[in-house]
Amino acid sequence: GEADRIIFMLTRNNGITHAVAKSIRKPNSKFGARLEPYMHVALSLTQGRGTLRTITQTTTLHAYTAPIMGDYTAYTTAAVIAETLTTNTPPEETPPHYALTHGALATLAHKKHHPHHILARYLTQAMQLAGWPLTTNTCIHCGTPTPTSYHTPHGTLCPTCAHTATT
């Protein structure tokens, strides 16, 4: 119905999934704020019609929404984390992505580090999980191990390849 909402979620064991929260938009909803973005919750689900399940019960484990939404930089960082998660998480590799995402959001909400540092670490680790490890100790062009390197948007270059690229 009009008061229902489809909720996107990352689960510990079943990957990214969607479920219907019935009557969530009504003022007396039993779910209400528990299913806002960036919440860590425990859910009970039943099989609904078709492929969507229905949320029947929810318990808040950690409320990250308020601290994240109250800080614009933290909010935009969380949005990039969510977008990266939705585009780069294969269903068969859920546990590492779940742990990485939960850790990033918890750190962001508790303001333990600057949001840009949290995002850089998250993206680096998410890229590695997706099979695109960041290489900083070898040249991306010739493969030479190089302690002295030149950084480009595509990776690290040794002095010889950097000189060739600029001439």
For each feature predicted by the language model, list its residue ranges.
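Non-catalytic alpha-helical scaffolds and adjoining flexible linkers that form interface surfaces
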Residues: 1-6, 10-167
